[in-house]
Amino acid sequence: DAQARGEGARAGAYRYTECRLRPLAEELLADIDKNTVDMRPNFDESLMEPAVLPARVPNLLVNGSTGIAVGMATNIPPHNLSEVIDGTIALIDDPDISVEALCEHIKGPDFPTGGTVYGLNAVRDLYMTGRGKIKMRGKAIIEEEDSGKARIIIHEIPYALNKTLLIQKMVQLVRDKKLEGISDIRDESGKEGIRLVLELKRSAVPNVLLNNLFKFTQLGSTFGAIMLAIDKGKPRVMNLKEVLHCFVTHRFEVITRRTQFELDKAKARAHILEGLLIAMDNMDEVVRIIRDS
């Protein structure tokens, strides 16, 4: 919950998340015991681990990913599960589909903390080229009180923004008198979501103050997206269609290997059954051999 509210908490222990993530995790691990993916030693060679998950779900786009290595970095935004699956089905139905047509199914990133994406050109660039700078803003409303005062209530913040750091930044700007008109800042976030309350002075102009918040704080920020991923052992930047195509190809390989595994298992079983049939047809001879042994 602390992570969902943008409080910058560390990653939760397995026991905190396993119940909610179990259905999706089972889809990611489905058929892993049927030789569907290659196995390799882990970091200390004490165990074998999958080189990649079988993954019935296109999790790279759904969950997003961020990371940095020598000479490269990736920053893939999360997407809506239903939209990504619709886009994947569209690609399967029409392998020659264009990126523009895929965008009819996948409208854009789906940031869990909410906020507003300003300008779709950056999203289009991301899907066409694999790179894009997405401008985001938090969402806020202005409430007028009978006393003549007003308050700004922030209920959504940009993705990956640490709420605590945002509050600290606003407090510092007020102290430095770069953000005037705020008399109090309260964090009323809870299970219902994010709620930051900024009490304003009578002399404050709410809309001007809100614009200054977007200008001087991370309430207005940019998500530098780059869809870099490992494809056949090599890192490369991919557009939307290429990412989905890699997933479809991967699933084809998984299903092929699963089918071969089940066929080999059935053949082994058939070999045993053939032997049993021969034994049943020659029961007297089998009994004689056993007695004489």
Question: Predicted regions span which residues?
Answer:
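Long, charged, helix-rich clamp/arm modules that form nucleic acid-engaging surfaces
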Residues: 1, 6, 10, 106, ...
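Catalytic phosphate-handling regions of large nucleic-acid enzymes and associated NTPases
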Residues: 1-133, 195-197
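Generic alpha-helical secondary structure
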Residues: 14, 18, 81, 163-167, ...
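Generic, well-ordered alpha-helical scaffold segments in large soluble proteins
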Residues: 20-31, 60, 64, 72-75, ...
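Short beta-alpha junctions and helix-cap segments that line functional grooves
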Residues: 55-57, 72, 122-124, 169-170, ...
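Solvent-exposed "coupling" segments
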Residues: 127-140, 188
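Preference for bulky hydrophobic residues occupying beta-strand positions
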Residues: 138-140, 155, 196-198
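Long hydrophobic segments that form regular secondary structure
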Residues: 141-185
